[in-house]
Structure formats: C-alpha cells, structure tokens
C-alpha cells in the first residue's frame, strides 16, 4: 500500500513539473529583460529644444512607432515563438545532458585522480623542500641589518 501511494505521489510531482501554471500577467518574474529589451518611443526618438516637428507629426510618429512595434512583435512571436522555444528547449536539454553525463563525471574523475597525485606531491614537499627551507630560515634568522641615516 505504501509503495503504491508513493508512486502516485511521484507521478503527481512529475505531472506538476510539466504542467505548472504560468503567470500570463507578469511574464518576466525574474526581470531578466528589465534594462535590455524595454525600448519605448522616448528611448529611441527625441527632438532637442529648438528643432521640434509639428505636434501632429510627433503624435502620429509616436502612435506609428508604438503600434508597429507592438504588432511586429506579436507577428514575429506568433510565427517564430514556438519553433524558437523548441530550439532553445532542445539546446538547453543538450547542455544539461552534457553537464550531467559528461562534465560533472569528468570533474569528479579528475578530482579523484589528482587526490592521489596531491598526496605524492605533498610527501615530496615535506621530504625535500621543508628541510631545505627550514635550514635557510635558520641561516637567515641570524642576519641583522643596521640602517644609518647620513646627513
């Protein structure tokens, strides 16, 4: 009975991961496009004082820019959004696969192998270098330096 309940729970967790609710209002909850993609009319087109166009031209330009940007984005996202989502999903799946099945095992293997070498290296340092530097330290510890300031 316990194993059956556990598999039902695991199946529910897997289902929840793939079919979680998405927020249709806040579509950038982590603010990854806060400063990059947010481009308004005022960020692109500006008229300095003394070189103003007619007010009607300015209003129509604003409306044209805003509406064309809005509908062009909608058209491009309709045509290319799903194929690009598929492409990016595939790419990140490949990256995750390589990281899980190649990168991490290689790093772990390297760390295991280097641990053996580090013990030998440490033994060599303690055997050969430590006595030499200890002797040099003893020799140099008796050196006295006297500084005189000549006027």
From Swiss-Prot:
Signal sequence, start to end: none
Membrane recorded as keyword: yes
All ranges on the Cytoplasmic side of the membrane: 1-83, 105-151
InterPro entries according to UniProt: Caveolin, Caveolin_CS
Disulfide bonds: none
Main location: Golgi
Intramembrane: 84-104
Tissue distribution of the protein: Expressed specifically in skeletal muscle and heart.
Cross-link (Glycyl lysine isopeptide (Lys-Gly) (interchain with G-Cter in SUMO3)): 38
Subcellular location: Golgi apparatus membrane; Cell membrane; Membrane, Caveola; Cell membrane, Sarcolemma
PTM (free text): Sumoylation with SUMO3 by PIAS4 may reduce agonist-induced internalization and desensitization of adrenergic receptor ABRD2.
Family recorded in the similarity comment: Belongs to the caveolin family.
SUBUNIT field: Homooligomer. Interacts with DYSF. Interacts with DLG1 and KCNA5; forms a ternary complex. Interacts with DAG1 (via its C-terminal); the interaction prevents binding of DAG1 with DMD. Interacts with TRIM72. Interacts with MUSK; may regulate MUSK signaling. Interacts with POPDC1. Interacts with CAVIN1, CAVIN2 and CAVIN4.
Protein name: Caveolin-3
The organism of origin for this protein: Sus scrofa (Pig)
């Amino acid at each position: 009975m316990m194993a059956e309940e556990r598999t039902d729970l695991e199946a529910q967790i897997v289902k929840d991961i793939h079919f979680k609710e998405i927020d249709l209002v806040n579509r950038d909850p982590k603010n990854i496009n806060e400063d990059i993609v947010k481009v308004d009319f005022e960020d692109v087109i500006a008229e300095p004082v003394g070189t103003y166009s007619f007010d009607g031209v300015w209003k129509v330009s604003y409306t044209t820019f805003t509406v064309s940007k809005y509908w062009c984005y909608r058209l491009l996202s309709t045509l290319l959004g799903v194929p690009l989502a598929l492409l990016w999903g595939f790419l990140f799946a490949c990256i995750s696969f390589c990281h899980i099945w190649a990168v991490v095992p290689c790093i772990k293997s390297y760390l295991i192998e280097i641990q053996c070498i580090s013990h030998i290296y440490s033994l060599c340092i303690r055997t050969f270098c430590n006595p030499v530097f200890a002797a040099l330290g003893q020799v140099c510890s008796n050196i006295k330096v006297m500084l005189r300031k000549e006027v």
